[in-house]
Amino acid sequence: MLLILQQQHTNAQFLQADNDILGDTFKNFFNLNPLDGIFKSGCWDSILTSGTSGIKKTGHLIVGTDCDDKIRGDSADEVIYTLKGNDQVWAGSGNDIIYGGMGSNRLYGERNNDIIIPGDGSNLVDGGSGNDVLYGGVGNNLLVGGRDNDQLIAGTGTTIMDGGIGSNEFDCSGNTIVINYNPDYGDTIAGNCKIVNNMGINITRDIDIS
């Protein structure tokens, strides 16, 4: 069944879907390979917390490398840049800003209020708890708000957005799909997007992004 949801400044297609349909729709949507420490491209994965050389931390600024980095923040308010490579970032419990570089990245804000901006490639952007601002990029992006009140802003590529628990704002552009939209909880939409009515689906569990 296809309905048209009318809102101010919004044209939204409202779709009925279940877990099987979502799995078929988004299967292989992302090409985010697991980062397993395998030697490639002339360097090893770098892990900040293990003291591996390459990643630089100066005060509250962390800059990655051209390798497939694994970067872990702490309780400070940090600014984290990844460069080339398929990177994973866990920002920690501060109010952090993450800038994703080239490659397919997994960027986790974790706790408190974060801003996450991915670069090129297919990216998973997860705000965690706190009032977060999540951006889509040029490629295929999955934005997950998590807990609290989040703002999810689509990029120019194909973007799937799940606000999670809280009152969320979805800013749609390009080819955007919104999951678990619930205006009764204060969710709002600006722009043009498709809404999949699948309340109760855990997007990080039920959609294959491998």
Regions found by a protein language model. Name each.
Residues M1-A12:
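Sec-dependent, cleavable N-terminal signal peptides
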Residues Q6, D36-G37, K56, G155, ...:
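Processing junctions and N-termini across compartments
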Residues Q13-I21:
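Cleaved targeting-peptide boundary
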Residues D20-D24, N28-S93, T204-I209:
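N-terminal segments that cap or nucleate solenoid repeat domains
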Residues S41, I55, G64, G73, ...:
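Glycine-centered beta-turn/loop sites at beta-strand termini
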Residues T158-I207:
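Leucine-rich solenoid repeat scaffolds
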